[in-house]
């Protein structure tokens, strides 16, 4: 299992969208220009899209997302909580938001 967090903020509308839900989809599928209304279609988005789409393709082919241009992406474990942060500068964080997740886990569980 590999964990990631998409932290890149779109420049569209003076950045008001920030890093909204599903914002990474055009980058994962390397459709930055086609979805410029979300990504801005600029160089920073394209550079990140190249990295992300390569990682997703490599994972689909081999089960391992590691690819050129990214730091080593370690598998997620409960102990380490290795998480790849996708932003202009990509990197690994460990036990990212651990305190927040501990609070969330105290919430009562309700059925759907």
What would you call each of these model-derived segments?
Residues 1-112:
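C-terminal helix-and-tail extensions that cap enzymatic domains
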């Amino acid at each position: 299992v590999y964990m990631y967090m998409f932290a890149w903020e779109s420049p569209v509308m003076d950045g008001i969208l920030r890093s909204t839900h599903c914002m990474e989809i055009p980058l994962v599928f390397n459709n930055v220009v086609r979805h410029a209304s979300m990504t801005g279609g600029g160089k920073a988005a394209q550079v990140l899209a190249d990295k992300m789409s390569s990682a997703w393709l490599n994972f689909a082919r081999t089960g391992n997302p590691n690819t050129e241009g990214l730091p080593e992406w370690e598998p997620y474990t409960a102990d380490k909580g290795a998480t790849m942060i996708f932003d202009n500068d990509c990197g690994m964080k460990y036990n990212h938001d651990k305190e927040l997740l501990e609070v969330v886990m105290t919430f009562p569980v309700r059925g759907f």
